[in-house]
């Protein structure tokens, strides 16, 4: 959802004005950690009725990161793109728990985002999130579905917080068009948005029964 804005403010972007006339999905993302990390992390998680109390704060991750530092190991987490919402939500969650996610310094051409960080946030393509975590390249990740549910279902990791607990009704996927196209093709743009609205209503009909046919 942040990509249209990034296309204008990112120093490395081509400065193409993009409009977003329709939001395709809200929330739908989560933060997942490996089983090894969770086994250590859960020692610091508040419990309720013998179950972890959600949402889980990143503060419970601090002792785990401290152990990595003592062993001179880098604690690495994956995210989809520097200007994507998954990166922003991961950074917010970490910072709220007292973990420095790192900063950017465009004035000195340092866009790593890891200045002063306690963790290393690295870009991983969504389909590779699970495999890189299982292989030990990362210790967890922030991504949209289905990559969190798949990791949980296959027993590879634990989802510690969903995106709606960080930003309720936060836009995830949006329909974007270049401003130039929309201005030159107003009728086509209107018809595209109408089609998306009708499709959305169809997907929600009969208690979401049509979604199976759509997939």
Model-derived features with residue positions:
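Short, glycine-/small- and polar/acidic-enriched structural segments
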Residues: 1-122, 134-135, 139-149, 156-169
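Pocket-lining segment of extracytoplasmic ligand-binding domains
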Residues: 128-215
């Amino acid at each position: 959802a942040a990509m249209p804005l990034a296309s204008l403010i990112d120093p490395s972007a081509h400065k193409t004005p993009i409009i977003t006339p329709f939001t395709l999905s809200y929330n739908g993302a989560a933060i997942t950690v490996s089983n090894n990390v969770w086994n250590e992390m859960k020692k610091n998680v508040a419990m309720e009725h013998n179950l972890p109390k959600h949402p889980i704060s990143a503060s419970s991750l601090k002792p785990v990161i401290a152990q990595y530092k003592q062993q001179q190991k880098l604690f690495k987490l994956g995210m989809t793109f520097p200007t994507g919402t998954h990166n922003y939500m991961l950074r917010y969650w970490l910072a709220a728990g007292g973990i420095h996610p790192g900063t950017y310094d465009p004035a000195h051409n340092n866009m790593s985002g890891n200045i002063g960080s306690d963790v290393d946030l690295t870009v991983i393509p969504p389909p590779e999130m699970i495999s890189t975590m299982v292989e030990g390249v990362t210790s967890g990740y922030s991504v949209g579905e289905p990559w969190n549910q798949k990791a949980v279902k296959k027993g590879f990791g634990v989802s510690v917080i969903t995106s709606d607990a960080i930003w309720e009704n936060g836009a995830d996927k949006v329909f974007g068009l270049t401003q130039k196209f929309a201005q030159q093709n107003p009728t086509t743009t209107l018809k595209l948005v109408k089609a998306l609205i009708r499709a959305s209503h169809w997907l929600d009909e009969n208690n979401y029964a049509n979604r199976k046919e759509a997939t």
